[in-house]
């Protein structure tokens, strides 16, 4: 438990996450993420991203580029890097204001992987195996452990920011 408290301290005080506009400190936290694994289309915009733009005016928005989640299926490292930069530019272009919100890359905040690992050590494998996506894909030859532990990384993402709202 002490280690988890240390992780919260690290995230809240020593990373880019703490650089949000001081005016946002009293606002409730909204946390959401998007993978840099494909081209953004009108469905992404209308289904999620437009909502983020609106939410940043009322809440303290943490918009995560979920590159660690994206690598649960094989990806070319150069493609992920390129798509991550492209996605960051796109988020700003559609109206996510870096002066109102925090836009960050998941892998640049080590606490995500660290807390994810801690949660992995506390989570029964049977619980993870019940995940629908895992059940559907486990028979394929290319299924990796990252898919199995995806839910614990998602939980870590949310817990680190103590979000009150997590739009999906």
Show where each model-derived region lies.
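Acidic, Ala/Val/Gly-enriched low-complexity intrinsically disordered segments
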Residues: 5, 11-14
């Amino acid at each position: 438990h002490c280690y988890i408290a240390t992780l919260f301290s690290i995230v809240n005080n020593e990373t880019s996450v703490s650089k949000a506009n001081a005016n946002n400190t009293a606002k409730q936290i909204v946390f959401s993420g998007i993978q840099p694994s494909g081209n953004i289309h009108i469905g992404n915009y209308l289904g999620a991203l437009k909502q983020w733009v609106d939410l940043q005016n009322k809440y303290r928005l943490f918009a995560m580029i979920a590159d660690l989640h994206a690598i649960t299926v094989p990806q070319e490292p150069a493609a992920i890097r390129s798509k991550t930069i492209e996605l960051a530019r796109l988020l700003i272009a559609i109206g996510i204001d870096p002066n109102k919100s925090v836009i960050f890359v998941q892998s640049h905040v080590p606490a995500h992987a660290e807390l994810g690992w801690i949660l992995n050590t506390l989570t029964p494998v049977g619980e993870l195996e019940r995940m629908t996506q895992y059940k559907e894909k486990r028979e394929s030859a290319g299924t990796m452990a990252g898919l199995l532990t995806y839910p614990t990384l998602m939980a870590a993402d949310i817990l680190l920011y103590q979000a009150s709202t997590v739009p999906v």
